[in-house]
Each structure stands twice: as structure tokens, then as C-alpha cells.
A protein has these predicted regions:
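Mobile, glycine-rich extracellular loop/lid and propeptide segments
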Residues: 1-6, 11-23
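A post-motif C-terminal structural segment
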Residues: 22-222
Length: 222
């Protein structure tokens, strides 16, 4: 869809709360036999129609004798930046914002980057003409795969805030805006309780994601 829209004169942006070369986001700009071919996937950005890409940094597993990824992308006219904030405008031209970390919503601080911010900045940059923004809430799936129900609930709420940013634009341009919300395959099984013993309130006591909890435990083991 990104290529089709670009061929029809639309500016195209892709924003994600996970890795720029992770499968969900990469499926909109790359073709590969294996999702683990991170360098070859990311290098395809040089020929992609994307005007803007925002998300967590590439894995940068450089293959032997292959050119540094930043060099490849800069040669294609992309400007590389490492942060996105509410108070700063996105640079002109084609931009790739590769952030060091985009935390789970449960782990986020007030200043942490998030999908809603990315949608807002994409709208600001692309709204001068016809545009398409693809927003990927991949951390919902990651939380499900981790069997982390509290994190999944928080990520779903965070995704709702991102949709709200799109809806704000729709409210100002109702005749020119289409918002489509879709899901990929279900990931992971979630359990709230057994035999009717369901207590959603228990999830309010969880303060961090399982990923952050595991990292803390591993630090104590060293």
C-alpha cells in the first residue's frame, strides 16, 4: 500500500513503537525470506517511497563486508536523527528517526517517546498535501507474546491515544480523511482467571513490564 499511494502522489510516513526493521513495520517497505535478515531489510529503505520513518533503532547487525547502514541510507538522501520531541519540528526532506529506545507504556516516563507522539509529528510534517501515515502498535503483540496482560492493557490504551491524534486531524478535515484500524494475527494467550475468578484490579498493582522486570532480575544475578 505504501508503494501504491506514493505512485499516486501521496507522501508516505511509517511510524512504529518497536524496531524499524522489525517484521511488522518492515512489511511496509521491504521484502525478505526471513524476518531475521535485519541488515538487508533495513538497506531496502534506500529504494522505498517513505518520506518519514520513526521508531526504535535498527538492530544494526552488519553483515561481513557490507557498508555501514547509516552510510547506505544517507547516500539515498535520507536524513538520520536520533530523537523526536513534542517541541521540535521534524527536519525537512526525507527523514529516518531511529530512537535508542521506545519503552513499553508501563515503563514510560513523562518525556518518553510513544506512538501518539509519532503520529502527531508525522501529521505535522506531511499534512501540506495528500498523505498516508501507517502507525504500527507492535508492542501490543509483544506484550501478548510475553503473556504480560497488564502491559497489553497499557499498550492498547497507548494505541488508542495514537488513534486519537489521527481523529483530531479527521475532526478538522472530515471530508478528506480516512482512518482504518486493523489487527494482525493474534499473538499469545492471555488469562484473567479460572472458573469465574476474574479480578482485573490485580493488574493495577503491576508497575513495569515483564521485560523490565526480567532485566532487573538479571542485574541482581550478576
Amino acid at each position: 500500500i505504501t508503494s501504491i499511494m506514493a505512485q499516486n502522489g501521496y507522501a508516505v510516513g511509517l511510524v512504529t513503537d518497536a524496531g524499524l526493521d522489525a517484521a511488522a513495520a518492515a512489511s511496509f517497505y521491504a521484502h525478505s525470506e526471513k524476518r531475521q535478515n535485519y541488515y538487508d531489510i533495513a538497506a531496502q529503505l534506500k529504494d522505498s517511497p517513505l518520506s518519514l520513518l520513526i521508531g526504535q533503532d535498527f538492530k544494526r547487525r552488519k553483515a561481513f563486508q557490507k557498508e555501514d547502514l547509516d552510510v547506505v541510507l544517507k547516500k539515498s538522501g535520507r536524513r538520520m536523527v536520533s530523537r523526536v520531541t513534542a517541541g521540535e519540528k521534524m527536519p525537512s526532506g526525507k527523514v529516518i528517526a531511529a530512537l535508542k529506545n521506545v519503552p513499553f507504556a508501563l515503563d514510560a516516563k513523562a518525556e518518553s517517546p510513544n506512538l501518539a507522539l509519532f503520529v502527531e509529528k508525522a501529521v505535522e510534517k506531511l499534512q501540506g498535501g495528500d498523505f498516508l501515515i501507517v502507525a504500527v502498535g507492535e508492542k501490543i503483540g509483544l506484550a501478548a507474546e510475553n503473556r504480560d496482560t497488564a502491559a497489553l492493557i497499557a499498550e492498547t490504551a497507548a494505541f488508542d491515544l495514537a488513534v486519537k491524534k489521527a481523529f483530531d486531524f479527521y475532526a478538522a478535515h472530515p471530508q478528506d480523511t480516512l482512518i482504518v484500524v486493523a489487527s494482525t494475527a493474534e499473538a499469545g494467550g492471555l488469562v484473567l482467571g479460572t472458573d469465574g475468578a476474574v479480578s482485573p484490579a490485580v493488574f493495577k498493582t503491576q508497575k513495569v513490564s515483564i521485560d523490565t522486570f526480567k532485566s532487573a532480575i538479571n542485574r541482581f544475578r550478576r
